[in-house]
């Protein structure tokens, strides 16, 4: 008889996505326990929820962070960067080749590990509900956490692939074969329902114990639900939730649960993990007994500073900061070759400037948001022990979502308030524009405030321009603004001289193909062809 197996370790996960059949085993494995005898205590239920969280980032760089970086590279904010090694799937993504094989394992790993997380959540939702808890409120909270995380995992999938298979219960291999894609609308409907269900039973951030900091909260669920609405253009549905979070308009009550950090320098500072601006973060630890830290910082760091230099900021992004007069955010977003005053790190000075050498890097810039000061790095630095939490949703983005929503609903005074709240922190003048000009100002603000945080690709794909085309269609392609800038306007000494990475990046972009990633070929094969490839891929 086939039996489902679940591990007993702290961050256990049922390692089975849509393509992982080897975890359905006939016999128990040593150190593991089959599910028929599990979920008999509240402690076992808690461990299962821990397993649900584990798949947010997993335990190394290649499962999730490689894909996150690929998403940045597929925008006007980042080059591939490393010009000394074969970029592999990064080249296929950045050059928009349309070849599903060349996309390699970054996309496949992301797909599979998101479904492994979904599987963990499905198990938790089903099994925890069957156990009698002494504290029914706590039982509901655990189920709510699983629903929040399932909604999060599906949200990450639909943004990148469109409609995906909706797996809402544990599946045997025979049930996976023949599975089909849900529509994008159907996928979003499930995401919305999960976030709605979750927020009803999740605590507020202020109600969390010290040991629970970082777990899902009602505020995180509201923020993610509002974001899901916004990405679909459901502004009327997003508005009341964003009003609750900002305490504005007809849904205002009391004072906001979240605030902006006092200074932009604190937002990605290692000493301000889970700060007052944070709605949801990937939690990390520098405990060397476990792989619970992050290696994203190493992945994007300078090759002259023990990094791998994949995903380097473009001069086009830097120009956007300078055009806006935004010196503060530029300083805490982009680290430059030759810099002698690196924020938070006295290692670098006039005698020992920071190095991002032109021979190894397409750009003389690195991601400052993920920079780890030398005296805070683990040994070895490239081990998964960096304790910088990855900010997934913060209050500044909530304010900008509110600004975008109110502008779309022709409530420009409210949109101005939210936009200027973000600008005040970085000492930029108030925006008084209305209508389309205000819309464009909000879009620029999102690029600057959230630069290198993984939102740019989402925005380029979803924002419509006045001609009805997406912004991504205006940025890329033979006549795209980013392509023309690099081929005709840029005088950047790094980008123009190091042609190991070609400056015509993005010239091959095609819509609608490149508005989504290709579904991994392995998933299509496993489904016996009932899962269909996204349009335009070969």
Question: For each predicted feature, which ranges?
Answer:
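C-terminal motif of bacterial Sec signal peptides marking the signal peptidase cleavage site
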Residues: 17-20
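An aromatic- and glycine-enriched ligand-binding surface/loop that stacks and positions planar moieties
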Residues: 22-87, 164, 188, 196-199, ...
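Long, intrinsically disordered, low-complexity segments
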Residues: 24, 71, 78-86, 100, ...
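Conserved, well-structured interaction surfaces
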Residues: 46, 50, 54-62, 84-161, ...
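Flexible, polar/acidic helix-loop-strand segments at domain edges
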Residues: 87-97, 277, 323-394, 537
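Structural register within alpha-helical repeat arrays
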Residues: 143, 150, 218, 225, ...
């Amino acid at each position: 008889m086939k039996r489902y197996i679940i591990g007993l370790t702290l961050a256990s996960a049922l390692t089975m996505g849509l393509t992982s059949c080897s975890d359905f085993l006939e016999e128990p494995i040593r150190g593991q326990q089959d599910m028929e005898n599990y979920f008999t205590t509240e402690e076992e239920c808690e461990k299962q929820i821990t397993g649900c969280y584990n798949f947010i980032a997993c335990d190394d760089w290649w499962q999730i962070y490689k894909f996150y970086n690929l998403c940045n590279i597929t925008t006007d904010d980042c080059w591939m960067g490393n010009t000394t090694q074969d970029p592999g799937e990064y080249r296929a993504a950045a050059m928009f080749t349309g070849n599903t094989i060349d996309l390699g394992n970054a996309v496949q790993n992301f797909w599979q590990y998101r479904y492994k997380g979904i599987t963990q959540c499905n198990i938790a939702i089903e099994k925890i509900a069957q156990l009698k808890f002494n504290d029914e409120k706590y039982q509901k909270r655990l189920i709510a956490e699983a629903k929040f995380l399932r909604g999060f995992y599906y949200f990450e999938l639909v943004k990148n692939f469109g409609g995906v298979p909706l797996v809402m219960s544990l599946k045997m291999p025979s049930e996976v074969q023949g599975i089909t894609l849900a529509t994008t609308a159907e996928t979003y409907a499930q995401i919305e329902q999960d976030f709605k269900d979750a927020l009803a039973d999740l605590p507020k951030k202020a109600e969390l114990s010290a040991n629970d900091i970082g777990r899902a909260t009602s505020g995180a669920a509201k923020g993610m639900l509002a974001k899901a609405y916004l990405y679909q253009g459901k502004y009327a549905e997003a508005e009341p939730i964003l009003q609750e979070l900002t305490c504005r308009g007809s849904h205002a009550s009391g004072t906001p649960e979240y605030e902006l950090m006092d200074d932009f320098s604190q937002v990605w500072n290692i000493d301000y993990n889970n700060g007052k601006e944070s709605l949801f973060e990937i939690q990390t630890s520098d405990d060397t007994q476990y792989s619970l830290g992050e290696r994203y910082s190493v992945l994007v760091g300078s090759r002259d500073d023990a990094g791998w230099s994949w995903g380097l900021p473009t001069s086009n992004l830097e120009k956007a900061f300078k055009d806006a007069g935004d010196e503060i955010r530029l300083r805490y977003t982009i680290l430059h070759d030759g810099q002698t005053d690196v924020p938070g790190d006295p290692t670098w000075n006039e005698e020992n400037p920071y190095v991002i050498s032109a021979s190894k890097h397409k750009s003389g810039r690195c991601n400052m948001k993920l920079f780890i000061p030398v005296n805070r790095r683990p040994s070895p630095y490239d081990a998964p022990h960096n304790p910088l939490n990855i900010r997934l949703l913060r209050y500044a983005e909530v304010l900008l979502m509110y600004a975008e929503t109110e502008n779309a609903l022709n409530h420009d005074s409210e949109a101005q308030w939210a936009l200027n709240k973000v600008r005040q922190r970085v000492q930029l003048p108030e925006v008084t524009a209305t209508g389309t000009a205000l819309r464009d100002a909000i879009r620029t603000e999102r690029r600057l405030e959230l630069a290198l945080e993984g939102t740019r690709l989402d925005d380029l794909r979803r924002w419509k321009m006045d001609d009805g085309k997406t912004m991504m269609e205006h940025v890329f392609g033979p006549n795209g603004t980013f392509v023309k800038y690099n081929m005709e306007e840029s005088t950047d000494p790094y980008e123009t001289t190091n042609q190991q990475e070609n400056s015509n990046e993005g010239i091959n972009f095609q819509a609608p193909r490149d508005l989504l990633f290709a579904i991994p070929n392995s998933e299509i094969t496993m489904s016996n062809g009932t899962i269909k490839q996204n349009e335009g891929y070969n």
